[in-house]
Amino acid sequence: MANVVIVGAQWGDEGKGKVVDIYTEHADDVVRFQGGNNAGHTLVVGEETTILHLIPSGILHEGKRCIIGNGVVLDPKVFLEEIGQLKKKGYLKDDKQLVIDGNAHIIMPYHKALDIAREQKSGARKIGTTGRGIGPTYEDKVARRGIRVMDLVHPDTFVRKVKEMLPEKNFYLEQYLGGEPLSEEAIVEEYSVYARELAKYVDRASLLLNRSIAEGRNVLFEGAQGALLDIDHGTYPYVTSSSTVAGGACTGSGVGPTVIDEVVGIVKAYVTRVGEGPFPTELHDEMGEKLRSEGHEFGSTTGRPRRTGWFDAVAMREAVRISGMTGLALTKMDVLNGLDTINVCTAYSYQGELLEDFPHDLDILKECKPVYEQVEGWQVDLEGATSFETLPPKAQAYLRKIEEVSGCPVVLVSIGPRRDQTIQLKNPFDK
């Protein structure tokens, strides 16, 4: 028995979907514990690509129970659309395979309207939100006036809460943000349909998970976004609205920290970021464009082009520390094929001072310049490599450099988007 947490180790988009898909083979339960449909996990099975924003990636494996925990914010329309997409492809043959915790909060139309209107009003000071209502939903959750899944499936409770909330939201939307008011009748009518469809999936995730663990079943906790976007530990305010570090797996699903055995951080062989915020190793030249093109670096949720840069060990060490990572899964290593040299940032330079620790002060971080070590690239394709030993020697050396500068062992290497383009150095479920 082992319980493993998967988290992003950079600014999101690290390839968590594929790694979760690989590790699901060893799990009995797969749990999403934070975020919402601002995440996008891309899975490639054979010639078929599936993109999931809410439902755990393990859903592509028959017989694996997939749970949406209390820490997630749920857009019911997106959720039901994903179910339809999956069933059309022959997945989710048994509805019991999917569970939503009743304490998960619901994204309402006014959350999305507020999210978009705020960004428009912010202009140059915008955060770079996806506009999907994630932040405003978490705001209402923390303010203790959110609408939960359990409220949605009780019609009287839902109508009462909408009546209480909507006048205030409309006032703010109209009078301050210059938006259009929303109709109570339309919201209730639309969401009542969702409630009838959702009801069969609602259960208590915490009870189910703790029973699974007590019975010796393997649980995989699937994080979204990345550690450097954490609401507390990330590059605030250019962060997401939930806890993206490994500790969020406990608070977002209702299990204790003592049941977690391994924490695997997913990390690209280079770095990307979507939206605003500091990015010390960002490339604005032909190399940056090459990484974007070769890595197909466009958001699966928004379609926005991702910013690209060299591997940042300073940021990586921060992510390893705040999540207690026991291993790294390195993705998109094949994107670096054919490069003569590869830069690895090992420290920052700030006003003549060498910084080896990641600054939390954004005024400092914005002024930091990367200090690079050069590593020789490899000129051969990685296709066909099935073990560490069958990788080109210079690719092996790059992996060892990543381990050295991050202080964490590499346990998996992805050399392409397919399942079979994966090298496992250690299985975190093996105890």
UniProtKB/Swiss-Prot annotation:
Substrate binds at S300, T301, T302, G303, R304, P305, R306. It comes from the Bacteria. Pathway: Purine metabolism; AMP biosynthesis via de novo pathway; AMP from IMP: step 1/2. Mg(2+) binds at D13, G40. InterPro entries: Adenylosuccin_syn_GTP-bd, Adenylosuccin_syn_Lys_AS, Adenylosuccinate_synth_dom1, Adenylosuccinate_synth_dom2, Adenylosuccinate_synth_dom3, Adenylosuccinate_synthetase, P-loop_NTPase. GO terms for biological process: 'de novo' AMP biosynthetic process; IMP metabolic process. Gene3D superfamilies: Adenylosuccinate Synthetase, subunit A, domain 1, Adenylosuccinate Synthetase, subunit A, domain 2, Adenylosuccinate Synthetase, subunit A, domain 3. HAMAP family: Adenylosucc_synth. Plays an important role in the de novo pathway of purine nucleotide biosynthesis. Catalyzes the first committed step in the biosynthesis of AMP from IMP. This is Adenylosuccinate synthetase. The lineage of its organism: Bacteria, Pseudomonadati, Thermodesulfobacteriota, Desulfuromonadia, Desulfuromonadales.
